[in-house]
């Protein structure tokens, strides 16, 4: 089994790290990870997606940061490398966002992008 461990293909804001750790701690599920991935859709062609996942797939990359709790599939990684994940709270609500230098266009909500 291939074990891909990457040193910081993405950066994470302090607020994102804090929120990820808090949610994982509250769920109290052994080996729970934060999965970051790209899916087709949205108004710009691709969408950023996040979910908490116990399963690591064979070709997933583990981001070697704060106890290896971030996983990314290889296709999503090529679109996300060099980006930053942040967690924001404002009057509209709270959410994880990605600041992606590879995105040529983003929609107004910040959830979808094109390359």
From Swiss-Prot:
Known cofactor(s): iron-sulfur cluster
Molecular function GO labels: 2 iron, 2 sulfur cluster binding; 4 iron, 4 sulfur cluster binding; iron ion binding
Residues engaged in binding iron-sulfur cluster: 43, 107, 109
Claim: Iron-sulfur is one of the keywords in the record: yes
Gene Ontology cellular component terms for the protein in this record: cytosol
Subunit relationships: Homodimer.
Entry protein name: Iron-sulfur cluster insertion protein ErpA
Organism: Buchnera aphidicola subsp. Baizongia pistaciae (strain Bp)
Organismal lineage: Bacteria, Pseudomonadati, Pseudomonadota, Gammaproteobacteria, Enterobacterales
């Amino acid at each position: 089994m291939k074990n891909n461990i990457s040193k910081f293909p993405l950066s994470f804001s302090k607020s994102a790290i804090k929120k990820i750790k808090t949610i994982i701690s509250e769920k109290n599920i052994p080996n729970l990870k934060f999965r970051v991935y790209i899916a087709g859709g949205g108004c710009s062609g691709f969408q950023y997606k996040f979910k908490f996942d116990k399963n690591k797939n064979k070709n997933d990359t583990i981001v070697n940061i704060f106890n290896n709790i971030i996983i990314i599939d290889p296709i999503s990684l090529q679109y996300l490398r060099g980006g930053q994940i942040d967690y924001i709270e404002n009057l509209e609500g709270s959410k994880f966002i990605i600041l992606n230098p590879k995105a040529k266009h983003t929609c107004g909500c910040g959830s979808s992008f094109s390359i």
